[in-house]
């Protein structure tokens, strides 16, 4: 999830995935914005992912009402990629080892409403509205095309907050793979740049089980952290004409 135009980090994660012989890849949105290669990231995700979901940044830059604004990212990715991002689904679900797993970018209510079990003012960097009751993550909503007659998930996964975690809630599971492109530890470095060697590790989650099976079987979750050449991405950023690169 949350590659945010960081092609260097994406390639490192995809290489790790390849080495583990993982056979299905799902991206939870926010392919673009913040880093310098949104075009390459979109193309790579289209090539390797089985499913790509829409994120709030994808929608914000590509929505029709801002088409005429001179957004750097939208100009770079072009109209065809913009339309592709707008066509992405808001959720995806499947059975694995007898569990119904539902995925979305932020919540079943919107692209930017957040739940964070480790929530603090420091973590809420975007000022998004907060979900305080995790039960809401399992609800069927019109936003994701569900009715009250549809089955509710046993497991939900989402991105957006760049904070990797796996937690249990009332015999159900909530997980967040963190961010490939901008790990939360990097965002939380203080003004004195007191980061450590783990601050720039990309993250993703592996779910292992019997895909598309409604029969109860073993299932596991593994959080993976992957180093990448951040200096290359910094050089690309410094050499770009990205208006917000000083941030």
What is each PLM-predicted segment?
Residues 4-9, 33-36, 57-63, 109-111, ...:
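Active-site environment of divalent metal-dependent phosphoester hydrolases
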Residues 90-98, 167-169, 207:
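Short acidic-hydrophobic surface loop/beta-edge motif
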Residues 106-142, 183-184:
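Active-site-proximal loop/helix segment associated with metal-binding centers of metalloenzymes
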Residues 167-247:
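Acidic, His/Gly-rich catalytic cores of divalent-metal-dependent hydrolytic chemistry
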């Amino acid at each position: 999830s949350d590659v945010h135009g960081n092609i260097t980090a994406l390639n490192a994660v995809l290489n790790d995935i390849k080495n583990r012989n993982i056979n299905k890849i799902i991206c939870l949105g926010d392919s673009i914005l913040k880093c310098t290669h949104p075009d390459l990231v979109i193309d790579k995700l289209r090539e390797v992912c089985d499913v790509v979901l829409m994120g709030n940044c994808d929608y914000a830059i590509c929505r029709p009402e801002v088409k005429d604004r001179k957004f750097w990212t939208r100009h770079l990715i072009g109209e065809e990629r913009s339309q592709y991002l707008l066509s992405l689904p808001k959720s995806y679900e499947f059975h694995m080892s007898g569990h119904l797993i539902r995925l979305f970018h932020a919540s079943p209510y919107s692209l930017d409403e957040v739940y964070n079990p480790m929530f603090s003012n420091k973590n809420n960097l975007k000022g998004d509205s907060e979900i305080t009751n995790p039960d809401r993550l399992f609800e069927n909503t019109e936003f994701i095309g569900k009715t009250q007659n549809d089955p509710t998930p046993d497991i939900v996964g989402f991105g957006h907050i760049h904070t990797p975690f796996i937690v249990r809630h009332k015999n159900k599971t909530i997980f967040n793979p963190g961010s490939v492109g901008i790990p939360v530890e990097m965002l939380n470095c203080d003004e004195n740049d007191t980061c450590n060697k783990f601050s720039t590790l990309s993250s993703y989650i592996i779910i292992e089980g019997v895909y598309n099976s409604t029969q109860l079987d073993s299932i596991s979750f593994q959080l993976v952290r992957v180093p990448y050449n951040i200096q290359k991405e910094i050089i690309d950023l410094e050499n770009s004409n990205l208006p917000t690169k000083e941030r």
